[in-house]
Every structure is written in structure tokens, then in C-alpha cells.
Amino acid sequence: VHSVVDYVSAAEHQVYPWGINDPTEGNRTTLHLPWLKTLSTDWHIDGKGWYSTTRGNNAIAQENPTGGPEYENNYRPKSPLFIFKYPYSKAMTPPSSYRDASITQLFYTTNVYHDVLYILGFNEKAGNFQINNWNKGGVGGDYAILNSQDGSGVNNANFATPPDGQPGRMRMYTWNASIPERDGCFEAGIVIHEYTHGVSNRLTGGPENSRCLAALESGGMGEGWSDFFATAIRLKPGDTRATDYTMGEWASNRPNGIRKYRYSTSLTTNPHMYVDADGLTSVHAIGNIWASMLYELLWNLIDKHGKGDVTKIRPVLKNGVPTDGRHLAMKIVLDGMALQPCLPNFVQARDAILDADKNLTQGSNKCEIWKAFAKRGLGVGAVFNLSKRTGS
């Protein structure tokens, strides 16, 4: 047993590291466990055993070429020495030729994100995804099932979120708008976007009720939260509020990504306002508006509190409050999800974020939050009406 523990503690994963969104931003490297000390367990341990494959307490990752519901007996890489190093290049084809690298990348990105969210408050009591909750609250038995190269679709991805105690399921697809086709597992923003659906569905209305984002506007905000976290996590050291970001650009092979507008604090580059949601029937279109507001919030808080060292994975907290504006924005947005009602609208979600900041910092960021929302028409006088919103 001692030798197995030694191997696990020295596990290696060859991946695009945290902060590199896709193959255009950097190179793969070999990383060693552990990166983060959280209250959850090791990535390859669940309290019942050690797994010399892409399985652990937080996630189980495998290929799923048929697109079917089975996963436990599906193929996943195995390494008795816990060395997960496999070849991949953008020129390799077909995708099945690099399935080991794809599964390993998906497993890595998801586990890092789990640990970051844990520090920010998405833990066992909040309804996170873990097999073993270590008697810390919530319901266990629900790691995230991660399907790489899932055969049930293309040019997309999804995450199914049942109530706490039942595993979530992420399906990652290949994208065929380029030659060779591209694997969404190598675009971290897509993985983070999908996992965040699990987070927002578990937090809104409580972990026992995962249907609280089922309405059009709340579902749209679900897409927006997912884009927001994917974007906040990929910030670079030299970024400023003048930096714009796309969503899904690499996988889709579209220079402007898969949203109508880039995420930008410029009203010229991204003119989205609250009232633009009138008449929209697409949750992704509504989400583009909501995430644009959150991007304003992100930069208002960064300008006030600094960006921190974005090359470091672990959020730094003092008395439970993130010390940098980036993680502070992520924290109050997370906390707001838990405070808002079931089936919230933009106004209610905005108010929940204000309440979250009041609970966390005694409201010291109230002005920055109001300015962010008011800039895009969700100020003090904004009123929700599904067909005719009032901007302010």
C-alpha cells in the first residue's frame, strides 16, 4: 500500500496546463500532483481505493465513441505508475489516435476546476461532485462522468445535472469545421463552461433541486455564468479591461468564436444591453448578454483589487475573502447563485450578487457592482418583463 501511495503522490499528467485555454496559447507540459491542497482527496483516490487510471473522487473520464449511456466499462488509459503521458499534436488524425491524451486532458482540467471551486465555496455542503464527501455534508456518490470524444454529437458539448447524490455527466464532442477536426477536450474554456452548468444548477435553489434554471431567462443566465467562469479563468498577466475574449474560437475554427459578440468592456465591440433580451428565444443569446455584464463586474473588481498572480492556480483568501479582484468576482457570483430564488431573472440574480458581496465584504464593492450592471442597462430602475424589459 505504501508504494501505491508514493506513486499516486508523484502522479504525472502531460497536458495543456491551467491558464492555457487551447493549443494556440501554449504547449503541453508534464505536471506532477498535487497542485492544490484542498479538503477534498487526491484525484486518483476516493477513500475506497487507488485508481491507476483517469478515475478518482471527483471524476471518472473515458472515451465514449458510441454516445451511449454506459461508461464504467468504457476505455480509459491505465498506468500502474500513475504516469499519464501520451502523444498529441494538432495534426494528428483521426481523434481516436490521441484518445489517451484527450481523456487525460479532460480529467486534468476538470479536477483543477473542482479544486479551485472548492476553495471558493463549492464544497460538499453546497452540493459539489464527489463520490466520498468525508462526512462534511451533502450527499456523496456523485462524481462527474466525463466522456471524451462522445459519439452522440458534434460541434458542441453538454452537461447533465441531476440532484445532489447522482453523478453529473459531461459529453465532450469533436468539432468538424477544420481539417483535421478538433477535440473540444483541448479547449479548457469549453470544459469549464460545461462543468459550470453543474455548479449553477446545484447552487440555484439548493443541491436537491437541479431544475431551477429551466426557464428561458434563468437558462440563459446558466449559459452566461458558464461563459463567465471560462473567461475569468483564462486571463493572462498582461490583460487589462481593454482585453477582449471569445468563446469556443479554437474548437469551432471561427475567429470571433461561437457567440454574437466577444466579451469586452467596449460598448463598440460588444454593445449588448439588458433590453436586448426582449424577443430572444435562445438561451445562448441571452447568456451572451448576462456574461457581458459579469465581464464588466470582473474588470471593475480587478481595477479595484488587482488581478493577482494569474499564473498561480490556487485562489488566495484572507478571512474567507479572495485578495484579488478576479477570484473575488468569481466568489460573489458563486455565492449569488446560492442566494437567488429558483428560476431567477436578471434583476433577481443581480440583487443576489449584491447580497453576496454584502455578506462577504459588508458591501464594500457595492459601487463597482452597480456600475457594472448599470453600464449595460441593469441599473437601479431596471424592471423584468419577459417580453418588454425596462432598462436603466
From Swiss-Prot:
Needed cofactors: Zn(2+)
Localization, UniProt: Secreted
Pfam families found in the cross-reference section: Peptidase_M36
Class in the EC hierarchy, top level: hydrolase
InterPro entries for this protein: Fungal_virulence_M36, Peptidase_M36, Peptidase_M4/M1_CTD_sf
GO molecular function: metalloendopeptidase activity; zinc ion binding
Annotated keywords: Glycoprotein, Hydrolase, Metal-binding, Metalloprotease, Protease, Secreted, Virulence, Zinc, Zymogen
Superkingdom, natural source: Eukaryota
Residues at the catalytic site: 194
GO biological process: proteolysis
Similarity remark: Belongs to the peptidase M36 family.
Free-text function comment from the UniProt entry: Secreted metalloproteinase probably acting as a virulence factor.
Name listed for the protein in its UniProt record: Extracellular metalloproteinase 4
Organism: Trichophyton soudanense
Lineage: Eukaryota, Fungi, Dikarya, Ascomycota, Pezizomycotina
Gene that this polypeptide is encoded by: MEP4
